């Protein structure tokens, strides 16, 4: 049984988690540096935003149960996935300006998804510890040996 004072010291305060804006900017930098690698997560049926969040939590030493984030993922993917499919199928049929507007809307949906994931995270009781969030997620997707393996903490 853990000492209660140790548990209190290991607890992650809400202010220690990234704000939606900070996470959006951090994600843009990390994703932009290796977009093709991160897109492999999506190609395997995963969520890039979730993978980025799990990577960030690994960097901070904050383990999380993937099932705790599942409701947020289901809620946001229900909107994002069909929109992404519509945008891709419309690319050949719409003008460049319309396509860019669709892409901009998709980015707003991505940002919304990040916000919902972060809000869900803030509702959890989180503790510092050994964290293998990204490895666990990539393993579920069958991608633990893929191009992102060097990011696993």
PLM feature segments, named:
Residues 39, 54, 87-88, 118-122:
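Amphipathic alpha-helical segments within well-ordered protein domains
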Residues 20-43:
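Short amphipathic alpha-helical segments and their helix-coil junctions
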Residues 2-26:
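Charged, compositionally biased N-terminal leader segments and the immediate start
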Residues 1-7, 34, 82:
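Intrinsic low-complexity, intrinsically disordered or marginally ordered coil/linker segments
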Residues 35-70:
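N-terminal interaction modules that seed assembly of large macromolecular complexes
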Residues 60-117:
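Structured binding/interaction patches within domain cores
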């Amino acid at each position: 049984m853990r000492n209660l004072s140790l548990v209190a010291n290991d607890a992650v305060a809400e202010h220690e988690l990234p704000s939606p804006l900070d996470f959006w900017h951090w994600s843009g930098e990390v994703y932009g540096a290796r977009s093709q690698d991160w897109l492999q997560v999506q190609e395997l049926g995963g969520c890039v935003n979730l993978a980025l969040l799990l990577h960030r939590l690994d960097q901070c030493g904050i383990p999380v149960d993937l099932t705790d984030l599942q409701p947020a993922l289901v809620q946001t993917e229900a909107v994002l996935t069909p929109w992404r499919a519509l945008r891709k199928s419309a690319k050949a049929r719409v003008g460049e300006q319309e396509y860019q507007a669709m892409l901009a809307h998709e980015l707003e949906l991505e940002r919304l998804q990040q916000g919902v994931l972060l809000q869900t995270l803030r509702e959890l009781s989180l503790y510092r510890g050994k964290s293998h969030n990204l490895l666990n997620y990539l393993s579920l997707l069958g991608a633990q040996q893929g191009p992102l393996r060097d990011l696993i903490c």
